[in-house]
Amino acid sequence: EMQEVLDDFLNYCYSDRLIPVSDGWKYLRVQLAGQTIDFNRQENVYYDDIHRGFRAHDYLGLYQNKSVRAIGKIEAIITAVRNEQGELEYNVERGTMAEEHKATINKAIESGRSKGYDMVAERYFFVEQFYDTDFRKTTPRAPMGTRIFDLTQVLETEKIPDVETMAKQLA
């Protein structure tokens, strides 16, 4: 539990730019994706509340049933906020935005609403492709929110392989 508190504090420091970071290339951020995992995999996107902070990371993992079930390399991070007129305002935080991203955001909003989520201000993490894996959690209980893994430690290498290879190595 203390590790979760430390991870939350680090995420706060990184999101508020209290700690400069240039090593995001080696981090895998794992998110709980219970009800949305099928949509996430199909559309190669994960969304989260815009107000949640996060540290720099290049890889995203989807967690369900005591295991990371899919991982992908992030290609774009885009926020979408509904203004007072009901229109979406986009901000590209990383990468570039294509029309396909806007279409996927609209699909995510509809999908999220059908599950009871209030989709007015979200951050969308687009990955090149999610690859199936089975990276089992070794600690008791589900992670509370986000977990960050240093892939150089997990894979015991300084050279991160392509995502498909990594997914196989983690399984």
Language-model segment annotations:
Residues 1-171:
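Charged, terminal alpha-helix-loop-beta segments
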